[in-house]
Amino acid sequence: MVKSERVKKVRGTASVLDTASYDKLINTLANNDSTGKWPAKAPYPLPGAILPYHRIVAFYGNLYSKRMGILGEVPKNEMLKKLQGEVAKWQAADSSLPVIPALHYVAVTAQGTGGKDSKYRLRMPFHQIDTIVNWAKEINALVFVDIQVAHSTVKDEVLALEKYLQMPNVNLELILNFP
């Protein structure tokens, strides 16, 4: 399956959300809780949403750090093989939901010092993000671009990564930590 087919399949083409089916799935995922406290009440997702209709197994990290996660710890081919192995294990353990691989890349890291602009964050170069996007294409994976905002603003960091966030398989993760 090529990337565009995977994205279309994952995102779905439904124009209307089947709320009864959604409610049933959410209740099942919450182990049919009878207290009424779980699952927490929340707005319905948009039609074609990935969650809760799929399980995502993601490998995390930053290519400049061996201590931040597996993306920087092991060579690409070994890491992708391990990720595909984990996806297969999860799919075998529970076939009720399709399992999707993902690469979760920390594209903006909080820093202990202010840096040139006193924002206490460091943006990774675009060529590193391009690398992750290309690796994801090889295995039809999702990409999560992780932003540790620090003293910057969500708006500034999102705008800096806008070209990636417009890609159909790229998603945003925000971490609002302050060193």
Give residue spans per PLM region.
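Alpha/beta catalytic barrel-like cores
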Residues: 1-125
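Substrate-binding cleft of extracellular glycoside hydrolase catalytic domains
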Residues: 89-91, 98-177
